[in-house]
């Protein structure tokens, strides 16, 4: 039987952890607590995806074996980037030590500075490494960034805009979350994915350069974060019944 603690997982043969949650940067933990208790629910259009994702996580999660999820959108610039970051922080918050989130696109561009700002606003540490890869389709500079959410550096990652099939991402047996309608329509088959789940979120790009720009990026970050937190909470309850 899999036993669950409020702040994390306790699996057979595993001692009660210095909880993974305790390694998250405090500002991120505080923000996750706020959006998980603010009384807001996920959108109705996401409920089916939530049930589907929670079910597959509960069925396939195993301690010591990574379960990989790639968030896919067109440009791998905004929603997929923020979604992977919020997914990884949410996994740590709920104690899923072997659940990892990645990002990718169908037409990669660059990690948008507004997405970076929205994540840094709640405590993520995002710093350029000095390296970069090939530019986006419009000639955008595409630097590498170190993205950190945990004190333990081994859990953090290097992010850059890339095709979902980039060698830096899992190549097979991953779950694909299609977080934009365009990618969902253009990429009906995600090569290597064992499960493909559409869960579209509105693109904050529509507000670039407008007075509400920062607020809309923060809103989308929190919408995706709330989806991740509540989905993993459901998966924990389903694991509990095994």
Q: At which residue positions do the language-model features occur?
A:
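N-terminal low-hydrophobic presequence detector
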Residues: 4-5, 98
